[in-house]
Amino acid sequence: MNWLEIAVHVCPEGIDMVSNIFDELGAGGVVIEDPALINRYIEANIWDHYEFPPEVLNRPQPIVKAYLPEGPNLENKLVLLQERLTGLPLDAVPTFERRQVAEEDWATAWMKYYKPVEIGQKLAVKPSWEDYVPEDGRIVLEMDPGMAFGCGNHPTTTMCMEYLEGIIQGGESVADVGTGTGILAITSAKLGAARVLAVDLDEVAVKVSQENVERNGVQDIVEVFHGNLLDKVESKVDVVIANIVANVIMILAPDVPRILKHGGYFITSGIIQFRAEEVRQKLEQTGFKILGRKEDGEWVSYLCILEG
């Protein structure tokens, strides 16, 4: 079977919007090539510049790629894609390119930019096909994203992992809502959490996260559920993680105290810069005290504590 690779050129603020459109079209997953993010990792000596072609490093804005199977409905999907891109609340309408790829190329296209990355002081993330031996005793997570979001090289994920390094001391209970690949749930378990609930609405994400949980040997600690975010969390926990988007965080915030212990931590991420103040106000109105704010490019993450 042949596939059509669709590459959408979009500003950083539109990456998640375009990803959601592809999900609606049935792509199942996306590849994000963000030159600003890649160059930050190169400057930090995490990645080597020779691993990336100049056209990627010098690109003026990110590209979001997806792969759709050729078939009778493909042209209709492309028309719908153009309509949805035109309707996005962005300063400029994203443009897209298309090219045919063979099945064997499609199956591995997303793998070439997924490299081992060290995060914070204690953690490292590697794909299963890369050799990596930590020199400083880091805890290594082996993650294959498949068709789910979150493999450790996106700022929203990285900032959450850095917060978890500081607050997981051992024995905590954690709820990860919108778990994606399960990376934050697995991070919590490997740092010493005693019990972790990982929830996602997406059945593909649930499947991928369960595979990653087993790959990392934490299936006795992490339970993965398919469900509506907080609905699956029945008892109070020490930490709640929500690496989603600003709108969903603000909807979730009033319900988080129901399942979070007093003095417990709420980590939020996936917040674009221009929504950060709005999210902060909502968190404080709900009874949270902001303990920390991290920024990375266009993204913001908050560490909060439930007072009372």
UniProtKB/Swiss-Prot annotation:
Function: Methylates ribosomal protein L11.
Domain of life the protein comes from: Bacteria
EC number(s) on file: 2.1.1.-
InterPro entries: Ribosomal_L11_MeTrfase_PrmA (IPR050078), Ribosomal_PrmA_MeTrfase (IPR004498), SAM-dependent_MTases_sf (IPR029063)
Protein name per UniProt: Ribosomal protein L11 methyltransferase
Signal sequence, start to end: none
Species assigned in the record: Desulforamulus reducens (strain ATCC BAA-1160 / DSM 100696 / MI-1)
Binding site for S-adenosyl-L-methionine: T157, G178, D200, N243
Transmembrane residue ranges: none
Chief location category: cytoplasm
Gene Ontology CC terms: cytoplasm
Family as reported in the entry's similarity comment: Belongs to the methyltransferase superfamily. PrmA family.
Location in or out of the cell: Cytoplasm
Keyword DNA-binding attributed: no
Pfam families for this protein: PrmA (PF06325)
GO biological process annotation, one example: methylation
Entry's Gene Ontology molecular function annotations: protein-lysine N-methyltransferase activity
Catalytic activity: L-lysyl-[protein] + 3 S-adenosyl-L-methionine = N(6),N(6),N(6)-trimethyl-L-lysyl-[protein] + 3 S-adenosyl-L-homocysteine + 3 H(+)
Methyltransferase in keyword set: yes
